């Protein structure tokens, strides 16, 4: 039995408040200054269409507005959240449809604002030919209630007996209600075996996952009897809210567990037991945004598989084939992940390596060669620079083998080992088509790297079976080597074919891939910081919005 039709939505993002100012705007009014307003548009991931999200207030007679009305956006690290800020001069009728009222616009991603120094960026306004349109200043602030963590403990009494030869094996499932009336699963307790009076272990959950910041939003809790075959028996349910749960900080709260079917069929039905909230507390913890705002940089490194199993790059059947019409799976994976991570790296310089190729002129086999052919400086300028070096390498090296991961993992680990203050966190993207040839050495490298500020993303391309890669992704069983277990789960593996859009929409394919492979990075960074007791540094001092010269009346 599936658990009560929970939807497949992501856990709610943290909420980011954007403050907007402008400087040196165009002056369109004849007898006074412009009356500016900013309109924010967000871009749909699926259709790429721009939709209006909100507007600031209008500030009269100024070219240097500091707007009071803010924009509050859900923030997902793993998504490219494109924003467009349009600035208008608004007349008394609030009419902004005329082209002459347009003062300029700026395009950028939400990640660029958060990744800016002190989560603050300044961008030039463009869009009016032949005119300097001034600048827009954007500041991102995480809403305070997004960092709250609720810890609670529950027990039950006299639950219905569901097992024929014994008592029930009860567990709880928590659901957050959505605005459209559906429910999203947000937590499952452990199973307590063979009892009708279970006491569950205390657990913690982000408040935003429980209610998305709405303290009165319905929280539904289902009670199930666990069955080995997965067809868990429904015992009953009850509803509450974050606000009601929080009252347990001062008193026990008892809920009746009701089974709607039994209630309809049996006149004398009272309930299927009770659940008691024994304790409830709320604490704040540091978030991913805290570390980014404090200056932590994400250092992105790429490693690409140049083994012969990819096929001749000159042939359309090759996974490396450079079609003039569309990107290869390798290029799509690189672009999808890199274009998001680059917003959190101030210098935009990315080391990029290949492995499994014979290098000219002597034909030496290398498992860690710089794509830009520069052993002293393997950095490429931006993701476009990485792609350019990758395409150039395909023209000069000979695809060969075998497939070794350990050398490039150890290379990045050596750099990460030099950082212990939380100022940098390394993300290695490995893109490969086949079976790994150095599994023992790779496991050893991963176990060693698990104690460092480092995460590894592996994307499998092509039709191969990737069972060995699943073994490296420690979601279910922690990776081990020589009896030593990885300190943290730092590997995320996905097969690219699972994300290819059937209609051939490459933008959508890349967005889906990035969403899955990057979703774990914030928590992996936080787990490293917590185990090392590293607190985020205070945001660097940022000069206040530049004060313009006094405007002449």
From Swiss-Prot:
Ca(2+) 2 binds at residues 163, 225, 227, 233. Ca(2+) 1 binds at residues 163, 169, 225, 227. Residues 531-553 are annotated as: Disordered. Residues 299-500 form the VWFA domain. The keyword Repeat applies. Residues 1-125, 132-255 form the C2 domain. Belongs to the copine family. This is Copine-9.
